[in-house]
C-alpha cells in the first residue's frame, strides 16, 4: 500500500491545506493528516479539537485518516510504516525551509522521501496565522477555510 503523511499544525485547517489533501488522496492509496503536538505552542484549537475539525472536513474521503503525533515526524512514520512526506509549497520562501527539513528527515531516515506539491494559485496567500487574525478582528473567512468549520473558528476567535 502506498501511504503518505501530510504533517502540520493545522490550527486551523485552510482551503489550501484541504486542496493538498484532496490532490494527494488521488495519488496515494492512503493519506494520513498528521497533526504535530507541540507542547510549547498554545494553539487556537486543542489537538483534540483539530482532529475533530479535520475529520469532519475529510469525512467523504475514505482514504484519508487524521492522527496526532508528538516527537519526530520520522519516528511517527516508522511506527506507521509510512515512507512519503507530502509538503505544500506556496512560495519560494516555503521551499527553502521545507528543503532543509526534507534533507534533515532524509538524514534521520534515508528510506523517507519528501514530495512537494504546489498550492493552487487561488490559495497561495493563505496561512493558518492569517486566518486566525482575520477571524479575531471579525473579518469574513468564507472561501478561506472549509465551510464546515467557519462557525467553530469564529466562535473560538471571539472567545480569545
Curated annotation (Swiss-Prot):
Subunit structure: Homohexamer.
Keyword match Thylakoid: no
Reactions the enzyme catalyzes: (R)-4'-phosphopantetheine + ATP + H(+) = 3'-dephospho-CoA + diphosphate
NCBIfam families: coaD_prev_kdtB, cyt_tran_rel
Metabolic or biological pathway, per its Swiss-Prot or TrEMBL entry: Cofactor biosynthesis; coenzyme A biosynthesis; CoA from (R)-pantothenate: step 4/5
Chief location bin: cytoplasm
GO MF, one example: ATP binding
UniProt-listed Pfam families: CTP_transf_like
Species name: Clostridium tetani (strain Massachusetts / E88)
Cofactor(s) needed for function: Mg(2+)
Residues binding substrate, per UniProt: 9, 41, 73, 87
E.C. designation(s): 2.7.7.3
Ligand binding (ATP): 9-10, 17, 88-90, 98, 123-129
A GO CC annotation given for this chain: cytoplasm
Name by which UniProt lists this protein: Phosphopantetheine adenylyltransferase
Cysteines joined through disulfide linkages: none
Annotated family: Belongs to the bacterial CoaD family.
Role this protein plays: Reversibly transfers an adenylyl group from ATP to 4'-phosphopantetheine, yielding dephospho-CoA (dPCoA) and pyrophosphate.
Classification via PANTHER family: PHOSPHOPANTETHEINE ADENYLYLTRANSFERASE (PTHR21342:SF1)
Keywords: ATP-binding, Coenzyme A biosynthesis, Cytoplasm, Magnesium, Nucleotide-binding, Nucleotidyltransferase, Transferase
Compartments where located: Cytoplasm
Taxonomic superkingdom: Bacteria
GO biological process: coenzyme A biosynthetic process
Feature type site, description Transition state stabilizer: 17
Amino acid at each position: 500500500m502506498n501511504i503518505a503523511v501530510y504533517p502540520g499544525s493545522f490550527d486551523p485547517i485552510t482551503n489550501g491545506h484541504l486542496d493538498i489533501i484532496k490532490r494527494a488522496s488521488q495519488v496515494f492509496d492512503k493519506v494520513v493528516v498528521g497533526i504535530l503536538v507541540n507542547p510549547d505552542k498554545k494553539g487556537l484549537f486543542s489537538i483534540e479539537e483539530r482532529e475533530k475539525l479535520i475529520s469532519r472536513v475529510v469525512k467523504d474521503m475514505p482514504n484519508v485518516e487524521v492522527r496526532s503525533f508528538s516527537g519526530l515526524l520520522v519516528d511517527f512514520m516508522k511506527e506507521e510504516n509510512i515512507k512519503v512526506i507530502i509538503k505544500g509549497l506556496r512560495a519560494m520562501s516555503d521551499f527553502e525551509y521545507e528543503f532543509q527539513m526534507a534533507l534533515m528527515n532524509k538524514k534521520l531516515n534515508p528510506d523517507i522521501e519528501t514530495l512537494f506539491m504546489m498550492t493552487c494559485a487561488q490559495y497561495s496567500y493563505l496561512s493558518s496565522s492569517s486566518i486566525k487574525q482575520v477571524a479575531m478582528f471579525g473579518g469574513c473567512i468564507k472561501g478561506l477555510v472549509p465551510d464546515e468549520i467557519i462557525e467553530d473558528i469564529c466562535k473560538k476567535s471571539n472567545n480569545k
